[in-house]
Regions:
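N-terminal secretory signal peptides that target proteins for export/translocation
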Residues: 1-2
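Conserved functional micro-motifs across diverse proteins
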Residues: 20-255
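C-terminal motif of bacterial Sec signal peptides marking the signal peptidase cleavage site
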Residues: 16-18
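Sec-dependent N-terminal signal peptides
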Residues: 5-14
Length: 255
């Protein structure tokens, strides 16, 4: 009886171990030009550009590796790295995977068509094919997140963060100020660019649409909007499972 129980325990344990897995998700890639719709161009670097005469709006998903290279001096201290867009060069124990801190897009607007154009970065949002919705985060929200992440913060002008944690918080906030997409008008023959930040996508998100709504392209004499346009950009990524032996199975495959 004891031998039978031990054999059953061993069999169940091995079976559970063999079936264990973790989720993975690849980098975001744009859908084809045919799927994007009219007036869209898809470039080799993964960016999608919407053209309305000489107004060009370009959106490109950023990988953590790219963001770490761009802020290389601020990405070598693991999770404590001042890079506000990633966890730096940190890795999960044993798997070697890099944890995802945010979902980041680079937005570029080039206006050579209208007297002025206005795009509110805080109104950009994501919808997914499985019913999820993500709203863009502003700098104040990210600053509060990092103030709490550092510990000891109480808000206001004196956050109460001690020592090196305060320095790291200020470095992160400074990078965000300089690199997030600015909330300002773009006058004729001007360009504006910066990052749009969202919460990390859930592991089951495969197909998504980035909505850039109510882009103002014409104003009346009082400065009120009289003509707007909406832009939608589609991206997808491979998702699936990774098994203990390192094999990957995409969500449409059968293990």
């Amino acid at each position: 009886m004891l031998k039978s129980s031990l054999l059953l325990f061993f069999t169940v344990t091995v079976g559970l171990t063999g079936c264990s897995y973790r989720y993975y998700a690849g980098d975001l890639q744009p859908l084809s030009e045919a799927e994007q719709g009219e007036n869209k161009e898809v470039a080799d670097d993964g960016s999608v550009t919407y053209n309305q005469a000489r107004l060009a709006i370009t959106l490109r998903p950023m990988t953590d590796a790219e963001l770490n290279r761009q802020f290389s001096a601020y990405s070598n201290q693991g999770a404590e790295s001042p890079n506000p867009y990633t966890f730096g060069n940190s890795e999960y124990f044993r798997t070697g995977d890099t944890p995802k801190r945010w979902t980041v897009f680079r937005l570029n607007v080039s206006n050579y068509e209208y007297p002025k154009v206005y795009l509110d970065p805080e109104r950009v949002y994501i919808t997914t094919s499985n019913g999820r919705k993500y709203y863009a985060l502003n700098r104040e929200q990210l600053s509060i997140y990092y103030r709490r992440y550092a510990g000891g913060g109480s808000g206001g002008d004196g956050p109460g963060i001690p020592g090196n944690a305060f320095i790291t918080w200020k470095e992160r906030d400074g990078i965000l100020r300089k690199t997030m997409y600015p909330n300002e008008q773009i006058f004729s023959a001007q360009e504006s660019q910066g990052y749009i930040v969202f919460e990390p996508l859930a592991h089951d998100v495969q197909l998504l649409t980035v909505h850039i709504d109510d882009i103002v392209v014409r104003f009346d004499y009082k400065g009120d909007p009289v003509e707007t346009t909406d832009v939608e950009v589609l991206f997808q990524r491979e998702i699936g499972r990774v098994y203990p032996d390192g094999s990957k199975v995409a969500n449409n495959s059968v293990k």
